[in-house]
Design a protein with these regions (language model features):
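A short acidic, Gly/Pro-enriched loop at the edge of an enzyme's catalytic core
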Residues: 110-119
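Rossmann-like AdoMet/SAM-dependent catalytic core
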Residues: 202-293
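Conserved SAM-binding loop of SAM-dependent methyltransferases across substrates and taxa
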Residues: 57-70
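Conserved SAM-binding strand-loop segment of SAM-dependent methyltransferases
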Residues: 94-106
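A short glycine-rich, Lys/Arg-flanked "PGG" loop and its adjoining helix->strand segment in the class I
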Residues: 134-146
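Conserved SAM/SAH-binding beta-strand->alpha-helix loop
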Residues: 79-81
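Conserved alpha-helix/loop element of class I SAM-dependent methyltransferases that forms part
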Residues: 15, 19-48, 63
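Conserved class I S-adenosyl-L-methionine
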Residues: 149-182, 186, 190-200
Length: 293
């Protein structure tokens, strides 16, 4: 796919819808609280503008909009079936403060929707081509207000290496299967078969068992788009931050595991990481290595 192309060609999410969910870590109240801990003055959640890129069927955004009728919420997704369902749900809930648009992120500018206090992109960044990732970061740079907060989730190394083993096994085993749900079921069945084999080394079996236990918690549709996706690119934390800084974005904090929560580590580990880290970004990277996150 070339940089002058958009994402509209053969979009798999119009074939199999991605199951949306409520994401507590993206709620503007939570994001504002984290920002205040670090000395920022974010817009109050009850009077703000929120943009969600890749909003899916709108479950997360409709939930937020329902709680804050004086705030404005905008959801963008490329899949038409997602937007249709999001609009239907918003109408059934009687929401007047949320809007959903079928839109390619490559076509969005400041003139399209204006500026925002909070921008969310969950389950998007690692599953799009490089030029789209660049566009997403540029939107955060261009569309966030001065005290605006951006939330981006992505698959992270080194932990993603363990997941990659299972993903590659599933992809190889199902390489000739075209039907999405059949592909997922065959892939799951193959991994389950491997977890039952005692011939493989114990470490391999333990890793595969752990990943399989996590895998089967999710709907088949989510597994299809996450584990069997053509594009699924993890990043080291420092790699992502370097790309973000090219777009004038600054790391503030993890949304769930705050960098200040060092109680998980023994004192000697904390001291060692502080001695070899020049900043919080490097400290976070060392922590990821230690936890294989």
């Amino acid at each position: 796919m070339q940089e002058n192309q958009n994402l509209s060609e053969e979009f798999s999410y119009d074939v199999i819808a991605y199951p949306s969910q409520i994401l507590l870590q993206t709620h503007p109240t939570h994001l504002a609280a984290v920002a205040k801990l670090y000395g920022m003055n974010p817009a109050p959640a009850d009077k703000c503008r929120v943009l969600e890129l890749g909003c899916g069927t709108g479950t997360n955004l409709n939930w937020q909009a329902h709680g804050f009728p004086e705030s404005e919420f905008v959801g963008i997704d490329l899949a038409q079936n997602h937007i249709v369902e999001a609009k239907q749900d918003a109408e059934e809930l009687g929401l007047q403060n949320v809007s959903f648009f079928q839109q390619d992120v490559m076509e969005i500018t400041e003139k399209t929707f204006g500026k925002f206090d909070y921008i969310i992109a969950h389950g998007l960044y690692s599953w799009v081509p490089d030029f789209v990732r660049e566009k997403v970061l540029s939107l955060y740079d261009g569309l966030l207000n001065a005290e605006g907060i951006g939330f981006i989730s992505y698959n992270v190394y080194p932990g993603a290496y363990r997941r990659r083993i299972m993903m590659d096994m599933m992809k190889f085993h199902t390489r000739g299967i075209e039907t999405p749900i059949e592909k997922v079921k065959k892939g799951i069945g193959f991994i389950e078969f491997l977890t039952e084999q005692t011939a493989q080394p114990q470490l391999n079996r333990e890793i595969l068992n752990a990943e399989f236990e996590n895998l089967v918690k999710y709907p088949l549709e989510k597994i299809y788009h996450d584990e069997l996706a053509e594009v699924s690119q993890p990043f080291y934390f420092t790699e992502f931050i370097a790309d973000a800084e090219k777009h004038n974005l600054k790391f503030l904090s993890e949304s769930e595991n705050l960098p200040t929560q060092k109680d998980n580590f023994p004192e000697e580990i904390i001291q060692a990481f502080e001695n070899i880290s020049r900043n919080i970004v490097e400290y976070e990277q060392f922590a990821d290595f230690l936890e294989c996150r």
